[in-house]
Amino acid sequence: MATQKIRIRLKAYDYKLLDQSAGEIVETAKRTGAKVAGPIPLPTRINKFTVLRSPHVDKKSREQFEIRTHKRLLDILEPTPQTLDALMKLDLSAGVDVEIK
């Protein structure tokens, strides 16, 4: 017998917002009777940008900026129809990208 599984991947720049959203999803899934594996922290992607400080001269003087993209993975095992309805109605924060597989 094949079991159904919902895999949810969350991405955000702010890890506090990400953990809060993951907690809401876990709480909703457990309340409706599904089993939850996670949240599993995935590697943080760091994009670094180097720019010149001066617009004209002084090439040696540079400034670095970085953007950190935090990721979490959630597996919802054996979801019920109530779980699907509750997850569809769930309103998460604006800064969190949700990808469902």
From Swiss-Prot:
Disulfide bonds: none annotated. Keywords: Ribonucleoprotein, Ribosomal protein. GO terms for molecular function: structural constituent of ribosome; tRNA binding. InterPro entries: Ribosomal_uS10, Ribosomal_uS10_CS, Ribosomal_uS10_dom, Ribosomal_uS10_dom_sf. Gene3D superfamilies: Ribosomal protein S10 domain. The keyword Lipoprotein does not apply. One of its GO terms (biological process) is translation. It holds the Pfam family Ribosomal_S10. It comes from the Bacteria. GO terms for cellular component: ribonucleoprotein complex; ribosome. The keyword Kinase does not apply. Part of the 30S ribosomal subunit. Belongs to the universal ribosomal protein uS10 family. NCBIfam families: PRK00596.1, rpsJ_bact. PANTHER family: 30S RIBOSOMAL PROTEIN S10 FAMILY MEMBER. Involved in the binding of tRNA to the ribosomes. This is Small ribosomal subunit protein uS10. It comes from Anaeromyxobacter sp. (strain Fw109-5).
